From Swiss-Prot:
One of the primary rRNA binding proteins, it binds directly to 16S rRNA central domain where it helps coordinate assembly of the platform of the 30S subunit. This is Small ribosomal subunit protein uS8. Part of the 30S ribosomal subunit. Contacts proteins S5 and S12. It comes from the Bacteria. PROSITE patterns: RIBOSOMAL_S8 (PS00053). It comes from Novosphingobium aromaticivorans (strain ATCC 700278 / DSM 12444 / CCUG 56034 / CIP 105152 / NBRC 16084 / F199). Belongs to the universal ribosomal protein uS8 family. One of its GO terms (biological process) is translation. Pfam families: Ribosomal_S8. GO terms for cellular component: ribonucleoprotein complex; ribosome. The gene is rpsH. SUPFAM superfamilies: Ribosomal protein S8 (SSF56047). One of its GO terms (molecular function) is rRNA binding.
């Protein structure tokens, strides 16, 4: 059966991996997933990621991050879903936890955090929220 929301699947794998205290999780590779992981790494929510091409299908190995035994990501949720896309202008981008969290946005300038999108004055599809 085909996967209807690949990005949502990756976020769920990250959430489940952190709840199970895993060091890393695997997710099928795609450009969008890699760009979202770059934002998470820049913002300090994951240690890093690498592409594993040893198998038939490329996989992304996501290195999870913990702080004093607690997951760095307390909450991760998909905002724009396949059945209901959510778009926002640069001035209307949601602020998560009074700026303590981030919103990941797909813009014409690439996948950015909400702060980067505001600084570049671009809006786009609101992919996920993380704190």
């Amino acid at each position: 059966m085909a996967m209807t929301d690949p990005l949502g699947d990756m976020l769920t794998r990250i959430r489940n991996g952190q709840q199970a205290k895993k060091d890393s999780v695997l997710s099928p590779a795609s450009k969008l997933r890699a760009h979202v992981l770059e934002v998470l790494q820049r913002e300090g929510y994951i240690r890093g990621f690498s592409e594993d091409t040893t198998g038939v299908h490329p996989q992304l190995r996501i290195e999870l991050k913990y702080f004093e035994g607690q997951p760095a990501i307390k909450h991760v949720a998909r905002v724009s879903k396949p059945g209901r896309r959510v778009y926002s202008g640069s001035k209307e981008l949601p602020v998560i936890r009074n700026g303590l969290g981030i919103t990941i946005v797909s813009t014409p300038k690439g996948v950015l955090s909400d702060a980067e999108a505001r600084a570049a004055n671009v809006g786009g599809e609101v992919l996920a929220e993380v704190f």
